From Swiss-Prot:
Protein name: 7-cyano-7-deazaguanine synthase
Gene Ontology molecular-function annotations: ATP binding; ligase activity, forming carbon-nitrogen bonds; zinc ion binding
Binding site for ATP: F8, S9, G10, G11, Q12, D13, S14, T15, T16, C17, L18
Function: Catalyzes the ATP-dependent conversion of 7-carboxy-7-deazaguanine (CDG) to 7-cyano-7-deazaguanine (preQ(0)).
Cofactor binding annotation: Binds 1 zinc ion per subunit.
Keywords tagged on the record: ATP-binding, Ligase, Metal-binding, Nucleotide-binding, Queuosine biosynthesis, Zinc
InterPro entries: QueC, Rossmann-like_a/b/a_fold
Enzyme Commission code(s) on record: 6.3.4.20
UniProt lineage: Bacteria, Pseudomonadati, Pseudomonadota, Gammaproteobacteria, Enterobacterales
Gene that this polypeptide is encoded by: queC
Pfam families in the record: QueC
Cofactor: Zn(2+)
Catalytic activity: 7-carboxy-7-deazaguanine + NH4(+) + ATP = 7-cyano-7-deazaguanine + ADP + phosphate + H2O + H(+)
Binding site for Zn(2+): C186, C195, C198, C201
Keyword Ligase on entry: yes
Length: 229
């Protein structure tokens, strides 16, 4: 049986990854992390979506220690969330978040004998986070396999897709409306199209506009990149 673990926040990217994983794997587990994020409503959204989409299990882990160590606008209410993309590393970056999340997801994958950990990080159309880069994911994957003496593959299906192509991927599986209306990507914790002001909402909305303006061309680009038929 092919089994995978999806790092699942209930946002656009991880939900799209879960939808695709359910088509590629026989058994899909989700793992969600509660680190005291200001947009904690995403945890309830993740629980609901994991059940609706048919994940076989969903584990929510308390990693509040990350909140104590990592100072960010996503972990501190007194630090304002930026309304547009910043040069350099933005204040929404949570240091060590993906180091911790991917490592814990790999431990869970080890226990349930999953062959892959799937994460929705992306280098093409991203927010400037260093732990979303392909180089980082590959390096950590290598270290985890050495440390566990087991081959657990880190999969990043969105790594080289832009936001418009990520919308196309959801549409390819017939789930565009669900991803648009039922996920939570907004840094201010507003479901669906979000607050419309934060950097995450701007990126998401711009990608959707690009896709809806020319769906055939974007879908064709997605298929070329991903090998979908």
């Amino acid at each position: 049986m092919k089994r995978a673990v999806v790092v699942f926040s209930g946002g656009q990217d991880s939900t799209t990854c879960l939808i695709q994983a359910l088509h590629h794997y026989d058994d899909v587990h989700c793992i969600t992390f509660d680190y005291g994020q200001r947009h904690r409503a995403e945890i309830d959204v993740a629980r609901r979506l994991a059940g609706q989409l048919g994940a076989s299990a969903h584990k929510v882990l308390d990693v509040g220690l990350l909140n104590e160590l990592a100072i960010s606008s996503l972990t501190r209410d007194n630090i304002p969330v930026p309304t547009q993309s910043e040069d350099g590393i933005p204040n929404t970056f949570v240091p060590g978040r993906n180091v911790l999340f991917l490592t814990l997801a790999a431990i869970y994958a080890y226990q349930v004998e999953a062959e892959a950990v799937i994460t929705g990080v992306c280098e093409t159309d991203f927010s400037g986070y260093p732990d979303c880069r392909d180089q980082f994911v590959q390096a950590l994957n290598h270290a985890v396999c050495l440390g566990m003496a087991r081959d657990i593959r880190f999969e990043t299906p969105l790594m080289w897709l832009n936001k418009a192509e990520t919308w196309a991927l959801a549409d390819y599986y017939g789930q565009l409306a669900r991803v648009r209306h039922d996920t939570l990507t907004c840094y201010n914790g507003v479901q669906g199209d979000g607050c419309g002001h934060c950097a995450a909402c701007h990126l998401r909305a711009h990608g959707l506009q690009q896709y809806l303006a020319n769906p055939a061309a974007v879908m064709a680009a997605l298929k070329r990149k991903s090998g979908l038929q």
